[in-house]
Each structure stands twice: as structure tokens, then as C-alpha cells.
Amino acid sequence: MSNTATDFVRFALDEGVLRFGSFKVKSGRMSPYFFNAGLFNSGRSVGKLAAFYAQALLDSGLNFDMLFGPAYKGIPLATATAVALAGHPQASGDIPFAYNRKEAKDHGEGGTLVGAPLAGRVVIIDDVITAGTSVRESVEIIRAAGAQPAAVLIAMDRMERAGPDEALSPHSAVQDVAKTYGIPVISIASLADILQLLQDDEQFAAHRDSVLAYREQYGV
């Protein structure tokens, strides 16, 4: 587990974004942990989150030209990460960003895109990948503008097999996205990093077995 991933998992716990217990998740499964990036909802926490996104992106060594935030959750993520990159000593230059509207605007500048023109190698930023719908829409928008999707950058990779229990895919939603679009998915942290923390920190030992069992059943 990298220092960035370790620090991010602890940060998510401190902010109440990552919790342990019993939670019904979007898939309908009962999960022993829950990651809710919507709880990064203050200037300080979003600023720190953006610094983690920026570091994970730079650590990946990816060649990219700009950021794209899919509406709605990706909008503040792309904006804040562009700010974090602008002040990062490893970043080269001022990174532009753009985002889309869900509804086209029929006055002013019009259209569904806001921000810098989509061009070059574009990184899509989101919190997690569940079904891959926002990624698909983003890829279509970027390609339609004549630009190239370069990667998807997310906060947490749940490393979880997609599909209903009776027809589980052998792959996770993240793996499906990478294969379908031929682009890497970069995550700040993953379920493997959460499990490493549970192994290393005795204060979370009570949750270790349930998370391990969940990964055994649904993990990739």
C-alpha cells in the first residue's frame, strides 16, 4: 500500500466518508463497509481530497492534457483537482478542465459543455465506478469533440464483481471500463488498501473478518 493510499484511507475514515458496519449498497448487496464521497463537503476536505487526486494522477506517470468532470459529482472534483495540480511542484503548467451539463443551455454560450475546449488527452474524474454509465457518457462527449479519453481517475476502487448475485461477472466494473474503452482506471485507493489497514491497525480488527468474507464472495 503506497503512502498516498494509506493516508487517503485514514483521511476517509476521519471524515466519516469510509465507515464499517452493515450497509445496503446500490447493487442491493449488504456490504460491511461504505464509501460515500458526498461527505467530502467542506472547503478543507475537498481541498485535501483534490490533493490526493492530483498526487495519484501524477504518481501514475500518465501523459495528459486536461481534466473532465461528468455532471454532477465530477464537476467539483475536476475543478478542485485542477487547482491542486496548478500548485503542485511535479505538475507541468496550468491544467485546463471542463465539465458537462445534464441539460443543454439555450441561451448565452449554449450547449452542454462548460470550461476549456476538449482537446488532447483528457482524464475523466469521478468518485467511484459502479455501473460505468457516467464513464460511457463522458467518453462519447470527449470523442465527439475530437479529443482522446486518456484515463479515468477515481477515489476508491471497490474491486467488486459486477452484476446480480445469480449472474456475477468475472470482472469488476472498473475492469470492464478499462477493457471496453482501452484506457487505464487510476484509483487513489482500493479495497486492498482498506484490507491492509484492517490488518495493520488493531482498532479496526473487529471489522477484518467481515470485509475479508465480503471480498472472498464478491471480490476480483
UniProtKB/Swiss-Prot annotation:
It catalyses: orotidine 5'-phosphate + diphosphate = orotate + 5-phospho-alpha-D-ribose 1-diphosphate. Keywords: Glycosyltransferase, Magnesium, Pyrimidine biosynthesis, Transferase. GO terms for cellular component: cytoplasm. It comes from the Bacteria. 5-phospho-alpha-D-ribose 1-diphosphate binds at residues 26, 72-73, 101-102, 105, 107, 126-134. Orotate binds at residues 34-35, 130, 158. Its EC number is 2.4.2.10. GO terms for molecular function: magnesium ion binding; orotate phosphoribosyltransferase activity. Its cofactor is Mg(2+). Pathway: Pyrimidine metabolism; UMP biosynthesis via de novo pathway; UMP from orotate: step 1/2. It is an enzyme of class 2 (transferase). It holds the Pfam family Pribosyltran. One of its GO terms (biological process) is 'de novo' pyrimidine nucleobase biosynthetic process. SUPFAM superfamilies: PRTase-like. PANTHER family: OROTATE PHOSPHORIBOSYLTRANSFERASE 1-RELATED. Belongs to the purine/pyrimidine phosphoribosyltransferase family. PyrE subfamily. Homodimer. Catalyzes the transfer of a ribosyl phosphate group from 5-phosphoribose 1-diphosphate to orotate, leading to the formation of orotidine monophosphate (OMP). This is Orotate phosphoribosyltransferase. It comes from Bordetella avium (strain 197N).
